[in-house]
Amino acid sequence: MYQLSVCLFLALISCSTGTEQEMNIDTTITNKDVIMEKATFGAGCFWCVEAIFTELKGVVSVEPGYAGGATENPTYKAVCSGTTGHAEVAQITYDPSLITFDKLLSVFWKTHDPTTLNKQGADEGTQYRSVIFFHTEEQKYLAEKYKQQLSESGAWDNPIVTEISELMKFYIAENYHRDYYANNKDNQYCRYVIQPKVEKFRKVFVEELK
């Protein structure tokens, strides 16, 4: 059911280079009688993660930020130093009637390499670790189940090292990180790292695009 191509993962991999605000981590928000849900993933640079998940049908918004560390109100510079314990993450607000958490997990695992510890492509450090921060026990169950099935599938020679932890606090990243790929497509990192990943993602998930 979850047969994946190792080549796809290796081709889709790699992100790095105001005022910070702690974000409410409630699982749901209500808008016009539709209950939205949230998912929080780390898969390398949050510019890459944001660029991919923004294009999915059912995704309302994607917010880059930091989670998983002990430092309060972390800055991008501090997180990049690798001393805060935080990972670069994207917090996704989505409509569960249009896209499921399972589908988000599928996109998550198919657009980065979950077998490289604290590393995605050329980006190295704990801030780039593969991680799922669950909001509910159901999300935890689904993430662990999917991870186990992938591990048993033999898709990779190396073990999956994706961390699955409860989300305690989420800190919104500085404003210039938002819509970074959309606003900086001439940037070399965007052209040579993010764009190829986005293009491959579009081919694999063509039926799920907005």
Residue ranges and their predicted role:
Residues 3-14:
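Bacterial N-terminal signal peptides
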Residues 15-210:
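Flexible coil/turn and secondary-structure edge motifs
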